[in-house]
Amino acid sequence: YTYRLPLFRMLKDAGVNFDFVGSRQQGLKGDFEWPRIDGEPFDTDHEGVYGIRTAKALARLPEAMKKWDETPDIAIIHLGTNDLKSPETFHEDVIVPQRDIVGLLRRGNPEVVVLLSHLHWPSGPAGNLRERVEALAAGLDSDLSPVRTVSYQDGFETKPGTDLLDGAHPGPSGSEKMARAYFEAMQPWLPEE
C-alpha cells in the first residue's frame, strides 16, 4: 500500500495537472501491478525506500536526483520512522539530514514547497521528534520556498490491523488518511485548472 495511490486519485479528481517525480517505480513487492485510476495508469514515480534511515535517504538522494525527469514543485518528506529506536540522536539522525534534503531540493528548484510529515504516532519517541520537526520547518520556511509540517494523527489508529497493517506500515485506510492530509496541505500551491 502507498499513500501515493489515493493522492493520485485525489489530484486527478480535482483536475490538477501533475507528474509524480522520482527515480523509483516499484513498491515493496516489485512485481505488484498497480490499479488504473479512471482508466489512467497510476504514476509510480517516487523516491521512497522501505526500511531506510533518514541519513541513508540523504546519502542516496544526489544520485537519485540525476535520474529525475523534472524537479519537484512540491515535495513530501516522510522520514524518521526507522530512526525511532535512537531518540537520543534524533538531531543528528533525523533533523540534520532532513535539513540537508531540503537544501538539495532547493538547489534543484529554489521555489520548491516542502511538506515535512509527522510520523504515525502522536506520543513516545515520535511525539518527541514532532517538536524538532516543527522547529526545523519554522527555521527553513521562507516566502520563496515554504516549508510546512503535515499531521494526520487525529483519528489515525496505530494498532496492528487498523490504519497500520503491522503497527508500522499503513494499510489502505491509513494510506487514505495520509493522502488526504497531504492533499489538503498542498492546496495553496496546486496549479489552477
Predicted regions and their residues:
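Surface-exposed acidic, glycine-flexible loop patches that form ligand/cofactor-binding
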Residues: A57-P72, G103-N109, Q187-E192
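Residue-level recognition of beta-strand->loop/alpha-helix junctions
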Residues: G22-R24, H118, S151
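Loop/turn elements at helix/coil->beta-strand transitions in domains of secreted/extracellular proteins
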Residues: A14-D19, E70-I76, N109-L115, S142-R148, ...
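Conserved SGNH/GDSL esterase-like catalytic core that processes O-acyl groups on lipids
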Residues: Y1-E92, V96, P125-E131
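Catalytic His-Asp segment of secreted/periplasmic serine-dependent ester chemistry enzymes
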Residues: H120-E193
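N-terminal cationic-hydrophobic initiation segments that often serve targeting/anchoring roles
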Residues: K12, M65, V102-R107, A137-D141
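Active-site segments of SGNH/GDSL-like serine hydrolases
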Residues: I76-K85, I101-R130, Q153
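Short, well-ordered alpha-helices that flank and scaffold nucleotide-derived cofactor binding pockets
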Residues: L5, R9-D13, R107, A135, ...
